């Protein structure tokens, strides 16, 4: 009987440790996200009179992505490294900057623990508005397409003739065998 009780106690303790780890990761991600947003806001306030480029801050924050339809406001990191995507969405280096001619491409994770920024991206519809705030201003995009591709179909990141926005995330959430793509045009 004592062995069963000890085994049960060990299982409960292990479960609590796993749960505590998941909660702490989520809290840490929220803290890092707030720090990025605060740093970006400080940059905007200090550079309002002289702005040289969209990524003028010394921080890793390019701007802020807002999707009102899904109540999302998230910092945009300047790259798509594993570290950046833990705490924000990220801008694919080599693609257009927000508001510029070309294809501004941004990636974000969907998960059950941390980095849940694009969990509701599948709820975005054609005609919805997506906003990006940078040190150069606020840019509004209108969604014109949404589709799913294989992970190898990287042509969705190719340059475009117009100022467009491409949001990329894994789908479905649990197995992530494909990529959900949301395309939008600058208004």
Label each PLM-derived region with a short phrase:
Residues 1-2:
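N-terminal Lys/Arg-rich, disordered targeting/topogenic segments
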Residues 5-187:
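Solvent-exposed, non-transmembrane regions of membrane-associated and secreted proteins
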């Amino acid at each position: 009987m004592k062995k069963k009780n000890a085994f049960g106690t060990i299982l409960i303790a292990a479960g609590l440790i796993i749960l505590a780890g998941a909660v702490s990761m989520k809290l840490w991600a929220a803290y890092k996200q707030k720090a990025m947003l605060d740093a970006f806001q400080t940059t905007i306030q200090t550079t309002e009179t002289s702005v040289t480029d969209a990524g003028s801050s010394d921080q890793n924050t390019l701007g802020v992505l807002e999707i009102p339809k899904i109540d999302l406001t998230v910092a945009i990191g300047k790259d798509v490294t594993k570290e950046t995507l833990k705490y924000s969405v990220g801008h694919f280096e080599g693609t257009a900057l927000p508001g510029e001619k070309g294809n501004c491409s941004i990636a974000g994770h969907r998960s059950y623990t941390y980095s849940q920024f694009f969990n509701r991206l599948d709820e975005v519809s054609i005609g919805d508005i997506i906003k990006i705030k940078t040190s150069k201003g606020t840019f509004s995009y209108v969604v014109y397409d949404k589709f799913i591709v294989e992970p190898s179909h990287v042509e969705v990141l190719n340059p475009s003739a117009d100022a467009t926005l491409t949001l990329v995330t894994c789908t479905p959430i649990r197995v992530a065998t494909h990529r959900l793509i949301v395309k939008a045009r600058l208004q």
